[in-house]
């Protein structure tokens, strides 16, 4: 009887604790999602989420001396004639998704390098691109795309330029999409998965790599501006123990003082504010000593910025990685489902980036220079 009573007490305690946990998790009224979270490893846990990256970057000077449309008074700018740039409202299949990724705006900044700087481009929403109605525009179609009812084809007012194009869909692509995209062959794809997917449905396609590998055009910093800052993008120690062990073996780096950055942003930010935030991140990455990232959007730009970067992932993504995975220093699970370390280290124990990306970035620059 005594053992039964003890068991009942344990059950009651578990139920009470479960109820308390549910109440804590559901009480989210006072939780604020910052445009991006930046905090230092030495900060206490209670203060980490109170350090706002936007507030910190407002103090940062524009060292490049270049000013873009989103850094000027919008009312004083004229629209660029015939140029569009992609924005992102994360609207899929009739509903707005909860996720956000400032990396999308980094992709748009890469495209913006090939447009005039003294005017503002027309905004075209990636996820409802077939419903764009405005002046005729040229639009670089780089980055991540999921084909659905809102973007099976481009609006008649858009002249799409398909380079660094990635398709998220696993299923067979609709015929209406295939018939439309064939008008603009050959299609430059960001990865081999997208290239092969298009070719298997009769579309001429080639691997062009990612457009963010051209970001040195506007965002490359001088070497004497480089800091000792180590940045973790959407990664922290404890997320992937095998990778942690490798990072701690890099004795040339001090991992006791790390800047953590989250690529999610507050969806309430205007598109101009999102561009501002993306540029400030690039300015920061261009001056870092080392970047550890679980985001392709945070890794590939570093190749162009000449900032040493290690891409970490727990699981090989067969849709996104083929082709671009080989351009990076990587620590994680490879295509054979085995843990692998592929990182370039010099005689001083410092990380340096592979240079294979250059053969593709040079072609992209030449292709888009006279857009």
What are these regions (language model features)?
Residues 19, 23-371:
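Active-site anion-handling motifs in enzyme catalytic cores
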